[in-house]
Amino acid sequence: GQATDAQTAAFAMGLHITGETPEQVAVLAATMLEFANLVPAIPGISAVVDVVGTGGDGSHSVNISTMAAVVVAACGVTVIKHGNRAFSSSTGSADLLEALGLDLDLSADQVAAVARIAGIAFCFAPNHHPAMRFAAPARTQLGIPSVFNILGPLTNPALANAALVGCAHIPLAPVMARVLASRGVRALVVRGTDGLDEISLSAPTQVWDATSGEVVQIRLDPADFGIIGFRTEHLLGASPERNADLTRKVFGGTDPGADSEVVASIRLAVALNAAAALAAADSVDDPNACSIPLSDRINTHLPR
């Protein structure tokens, strides 16, 4: 807390201008984790998954990663999602969950207990990285993606060992993948060529696959999953309340009414991204899974 907001912003912009390196980001992430309120390990759980994005893609889409996390947990894989309020997007994961009525103010022990019982829990970043409150004003005032956007996905307080990570700023995607690989996290870092920090359904997606421990860059196409002519505008979100309403409709069993087409599109996006997160989790217990083409690994988890 000794740096002024101007100094913090200047530090972030300096890194942004020169280009963040994996070594720099790894040191920043390690320092954050050193001072974090870590979530205790859950006995008997081998894979803990995070489904998270950097935000800042400018799409103002619904919270696909948060909904995908619910699907992953429903498939029997433990999820401990790390997230925050919106800084450079309309609605952050914390904003959505709060609008849905969830209590964000949980201790690290409570997060572990919820994950053990429910199979899914949420780490609200300020509760686990209290020092980051000093960076929040500068980050908000900057209003553009910076190193702070990528530090969140790299500093899951539960030390998740598998992840699907969306990265809106393409130069930072390989940096994130290398940092995660160096820590042994089986991760897929993704960025749609349309700018989405998700696996896109309307354009090819660049993937930095770190599930083998090495980083391999590949490309996924919507046609790989039988998706043609998808309309991205159906993924547009708005306020936390609107996104919460759409989330209820995505998981509800009732007729979504006027939102039927939108909800169907969101469900498809959620299913695809959840399948990718499950593919990342597969490699925790089965390293040989990485020898299978990624599109095939994802397809095995898609409903037919």
Segments (PLM) and residue ranges:
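N-terminal glycine-rich anion-binding loops that anchor highly charged ligand groups
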Residues: 1-26, 33-43, 269, 275
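Short beta-strand segments at enzyme active-site cores
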Residues: 7-10, 79-82, 189-190
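Residue-level signature of catalytic and energy-coupling elements of molecular machines
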Residues: 11, 56, 97, 152
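Active-site cofactor/substrate anionic-group-binding motifs, chiefly glycine-
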Residues: 19-83
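Glycine-rich anion-binding loops and their surrounding alpha/beta cores
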Residues: 34-37, 61, 76, 98-105, ...
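Short glycine/serine/threonine-rich phosphate/pyrophosphate-binding segments
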Residues: 57-69, 82, 88-91, 132, ...
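Active-site-proximal loop->helix
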Residues: 86-102
